[in-house]
């Protein structure tokens, strides 16, 4: 189970684009460490791995359709490397990152994989305080074109949407690993944004 080296090199170039501060190859490597650490949990690891590599491949903070464009890029790049069913599932995972919600109509195994992927993608919310603060600074840098007041209001809305969820994470694994720290980080960040 691997992604061809020439595709990885193309992705690294994308993740190195100048508008990125958080959504870089470092983010992908962090998720890959979580993916590897949870190796026994995945039912369909290959499409999950491909989704992991491509989920932020297209990233333009001025556009609302990055996830869709990333899924389409995966569908192009993955053709001939993944079977049709795996490719469709990998693209579905990427599309689910737009709202960080698990869609209906999945098998139990696919639902579990997609939920766990969304959890590792949001693991940054439950990172150590210093790591989370750097994440917040990096997100602000990616949206440097947005005036401060508008950014603060928009960012507070996004963070509140997670903080107000009964469970930020979908899986027991995610809740055990990251929920408590995520709630502390979100509360602290929201207090700063609303100050």
What does each of the following model-derived ranges do?
Residues 1-2:
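Acidic/polar low-complexity segments with low predicted structural confidence
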Residues 5-12, 25, 29, 49, ...:
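Short, well-structured alpha-helical segments
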Residues 14, 70-104:
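Histidine- and acidic-residue-rich, metal-dependent catalytic cores
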Residues 21, 60, 64, 80:
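Short gly/ser-rich anion-binding loops that grip negatively charged ligand groups
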Residues 27, 66-70:
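Hydrophobic (often cysteine-bearing) scaffold residues that line and stabilize catalytic clefts
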Residues 31, 45-61, 70, 91-98:
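His-Asp-centered metal-binding catalytic motifs of divalent-metal-dependent phosphohydrolases/nucleases
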Residues 43-46, 64-66, 82-86:
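Short, flexible active-site-proximal loops enriched in glycine and acidic residues
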């Amino acid at each position: 189970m691997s992604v061809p080296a020439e595709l990885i090199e193309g992705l690294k170039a994308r993740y190195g684009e100048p508008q990125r501060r958080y959504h870089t190859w470092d983010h992908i490597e962090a998720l890959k460490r979580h993916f590897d650490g949870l190796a026994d949990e995945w039912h369909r690891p290959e499409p999950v791995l491909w989704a992991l590599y491509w989920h932020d491949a297209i990233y333009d903070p001025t556009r609302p359709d990055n996830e869709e464009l990333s899924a389409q890029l995966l569908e192009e790049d993955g053709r001939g490397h993944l079977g049709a069913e795996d490719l469709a599932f990998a693209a579905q995972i990427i599309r689910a990152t737009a709202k960080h919600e698990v869609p209906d109509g999945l098998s139990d195994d696919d639902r579990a994989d997609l939920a766990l992927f969304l959890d590792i993608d949001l693991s940054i919310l439950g990172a150590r305080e210093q790591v989370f603060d750097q994440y917040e600074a990096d997100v602000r840098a990616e949206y440097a074109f947005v005036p401060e007041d508008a950014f603060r209001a928009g960012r507070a809305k996004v963070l509140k949407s997670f903080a107000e969820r009964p469970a930020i994470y979908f899986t027991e694994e995610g809740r055990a690993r990251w929920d408590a720290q995520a709630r502390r980080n979100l509360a602290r960040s929201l207090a700063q944004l609303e100050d």
